[in-house]
Structures are given as C-alpha cells and as structure tokens.
C-alpha cells in the first residue's frame, strides 16, 4: 500500500505543476480547420511541458518495453497501437487491433470511428438523450450516435480525438496529459493523466513467468462538479488473427459478474439490473467461463436493434473499495480471465472499476484490414491453418472497457454518484487496470 500511495501522490504533485493554461488541441480538426464543439479554436500547439525526448507530433510513435513485452502508442487519443507478448511457443504476437500507419487512426475517426486503442472520455459509453442534471442545472452534450439522439464516449470530439501531451517517458512507462477546458459542454475544467507501464518476471528464475501491462487514468476536477468516467478502449485478439473470429477460439470468464445493466434497443440503460444466470437462458452468464461463440446466436437484440452479439455492461460484484483512490488491482481478484486456444495466450484483468463493458465486434464486416505486420507475421510462421486472415470480420475481436455503471449519471437510484461525479473538493477519479499475460 505504501508503494501505491507514493506513486499516486507523485502523480498528484505532477498535477500541481501543470496549470490550466496547459491546453490540448484536436488533431483532425486542425487538419480540417474546424472548431471543437466547446467553441474554442484549436491552435496546433500545446503549452503542456513535454517530457525529455518527446515530440509535439500527435502521430509520433513511442515504445516502452520490458522482458518479453513491448507496447507502442501515439499521443492522438493517448492510443495503444501495438502490444507484443509471447505465445505458448515463445513467438511474439501483437494482440491489439488497429493500424500500422498512425495516420490511419485519423482517417478512421473521420470514417469508421472505431475508437481503436484510445482513451475515451470525459464520460465513457452512452449518455441518454445527451443530457444530464447536476444540482438542478441541466447540461447538454453533443449527440453523436444513432442519428444524433444520444452521446457516445464524450461527444463529437471526445478524448479519443485529442492530442495528449507526453509529459513523462521512460523505458518501461509513458504518461500522457490532457487539460479539458469544458470540452463538449461538460461543466468545468478537468486535468487528466494516463500512465501506461509494462513489467515482466521473465529472466528472474521464477516459475510461470508473466508479463504485465497497466493503464492508469487519474483525473481531477479543477473548477466545478462534473461527471468523469474515462476508460481504455482496447480491441483485443489473443489469437493474433490466426482465426477469422474469436467465437471458437477465445474463452471468456467474468467470475465477479453475476449481474448486468439491462438496456433498450439504443443500448441505453432501462434502470433495471438483470441476473446473468436467470436472464436470457444464461446467454450473458460468463461466471464459469465459456467460448465467446457458445451462446452468441441467442444474444439477439441485447447489443442493440438488429444486432446479434455482446455489447453489455457487466457489474463487478465485490466488497466496494473504489471510493478509496489508493486501491490498486494488485490487491484485488481478477474480474476478467480470457484466453486463446490457438496461441495459448491468457490474459487476467484486475481493475478498481465498478463494471466492465464487453463488445464482441458485432459491427465489423470485413472492410477494415488486419495490420499488415500481423498478416506478415502469420505468413512467415505458417500460422492460420492454411488461411491468411487479412480483414477484420464480424466477431473478429473483443473490446473490454473497465469503467463504471453506464449512464449512471442518469440513474441516481443506483447510487453511483460517488464514483462518477467529482468536484474540486473530492478526490481524483482513478481508473486503474492491470492486464497480466501468461502462455500455456
């Protein structure tokens, strides 16, 4: 606990050295000469202090590494673009969905808008009707989903489209910073840090070596009470596209999730909380673990209108310690256990969050290419059962978002305000998730 406290206090001290003049600009709006929806004009620069060796280029690639794990990022969206870990044969595999060319993430924003690998915010997931009420005041955020009827992932220009500043950089960690001066009509100013780090027990003469990737977002409300709910939006494929889909390859276990948030056809919460074992004949029951594809044909309509698959918020049931901002996943039972039959790669996820959103890539349709580097790696090794997967097909990946109960700000009866509403008088909003990889 002392180590956790020390690390978080250092982060908070770092906040104090960054004044509200530290602003971030939106890259694709600068390219197009447009204006963000908060009415300010992007100026193509940032007054945040850059880390030594860092660049103001939003598409500059940064790589951190430890023994048998390598992660690469770009500042555009504080985005993870590659994560290399070993499979059961010791071959390094990229288990992240995305693009090889950083420029393609900008193109994606303007076309598919997949949110590959980015940090979403200021408020992840959906806001019903793009509106919420705080202390009697109604706030309206840009409606950017379903014919502009609701808000998704923070609005039209969310954190995924901002150029975060690299404010700390080492061989095994990187920190991005974003000052949000009322973006997308959210109240008040918020300073955000996200630190990614890697660790490894390979080479330490320990049994069952493992690698570890950690994402920590720390956000402070500086001026007003406001919703804050950031989340890493990482698309995973633990079989590294050796198979067209994850349906018969990937096992998913959610041992702490016996409940889920019921949603309507727009994926907006109805206010009801369902039981995974008694609802929908157990289609959403992953408490004991099963293949993604085992019950997916029965998952008709639970991921929205005219949709078959998963796009659901699973509640993490455990003694509640998320209000303690010193809590860390190292003290917690894993909330996710996922593994690939093909590669033998296993991933355990621990988090201090209240819920996990699982999305089975229902909307992919083969129009987005698999990274050329992943295709080349599979060709070179002869993997893929004689076939080469070069397009991201439906159910070709899985998104895991560590976050709070979705749209909790519009469901006060749930009692989630302490974990989603923050003010200058409150502690920081912290999303801490650790992904541990082994292979067998």
UniProtKB/Swiss-Prot annotation:
One term of GO molecular function: aldose 1-epimerase activity
Glycosylation sites: 32, 38, 43, 68, 112, 129, 147, 163, 171, 199, 243, 275, 281, 306, 321, 337, 365, 385
Keyword Glycoprotein: yes
Location(s) in or outside the cell: Secreted
Domain of life where this protein originates: Eukaryota
Active site per database record: 233 (proton donor), 401 (proton acceptor)
Family the UniProt entry places it in: Belongs to the aldose epimerase family.
Name of the featured protein: Probable aldose 1-epimerase ARB_05372
Source organism per UniProt: Arthroderma benhamiae (strain ATCC MYA-4681 / CBS 112371) (Trichophyton mentagrophytes)
């Amino acid at each position: 606990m002392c180590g956790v406290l020390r690390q978080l206090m250092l982060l908070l001290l770092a906040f104090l050295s960054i004044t509200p003049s530290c602003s971030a600009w939106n890259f694709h709006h600068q390219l197009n000469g447009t204006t963000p929806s908060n009415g300010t004009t992007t100026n193509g620069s940032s007054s945040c202090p850059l880390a030594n060796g860092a660049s103001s280029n939003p598409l500059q690639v940064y790589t951190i590494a430890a023994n048998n794990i390598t992660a690469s990022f770009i500042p555009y969206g504080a985005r993870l673009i590659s994560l290399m870990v070993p499979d059961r044969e010791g071959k390094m595999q990229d288990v992240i969905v995305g693009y090889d060319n950083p420029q393609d993430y900008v193109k994606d924003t303007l076309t598919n808008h997949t949110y590959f690998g980015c940090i979403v915010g200021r408020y992840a997931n959906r806001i019903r009707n793009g509106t919420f009420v705080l202390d009697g005041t109604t706030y309206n955020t840009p409606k950017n989903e379903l014919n502009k009827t609701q808000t998704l992932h923070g609005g039209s220009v969310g954190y995924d489209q901002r150029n975060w500043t690299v404010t700390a950089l080492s061989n095994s960690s990187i920190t991005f910073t974003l000052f949000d001066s009322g973006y997308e009509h959210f109240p008040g100013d918020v300073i955000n840090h996200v630190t990614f780090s890697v660790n490894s027990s390979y080479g330490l003469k320990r049994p069952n070596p493992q690698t570890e990737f950690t994402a920590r977002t720390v956000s402070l409300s500086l001026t007003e009470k406001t919703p804050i709910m950031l989340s890493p939006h990482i698309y995973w494929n633990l079989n590294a596209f050796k198979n067209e889909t994850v349906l018969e390859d990937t096992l998913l276990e959610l041992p702490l999730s016996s409940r889920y948030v019921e949603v309507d056809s727009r994926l907006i919460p109805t206010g009801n909380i369902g039981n995974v074992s008694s609802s929908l004949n157990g289609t959403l029951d992953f408490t004991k673990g099963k293949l993604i594809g085992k019950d997916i044909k029965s998952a008709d309509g639970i991921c929205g209108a005219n949709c078959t698959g998963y796009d659901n918020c699973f509640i993490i049931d455990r003694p509640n310690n998320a209000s303690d901002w010193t809590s860390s996943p190292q003290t917690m039972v894993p909330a996710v256990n996922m593994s690939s039959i093909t590669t033998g790669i296993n991933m355990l996820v621990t988090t201090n969050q209240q819920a996990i959103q699982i999305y089975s890539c229902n909307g992919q349709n083969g129009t987005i290419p698999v990274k050329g580097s992943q295709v080349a790696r599979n060709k070179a090794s002869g993997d893929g059962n004689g076939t080469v997967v070069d397009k991201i097909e439906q159910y070709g990946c899985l998104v895991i978002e560590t976050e709070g109960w979705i749209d909790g700000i519009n469901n006060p009866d749930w009692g989630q305000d302490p974990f989603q509403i923050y003010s200058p008088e409150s502690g920081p909003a912290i999303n801490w998730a650790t992904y541990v990889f082994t292979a067998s």
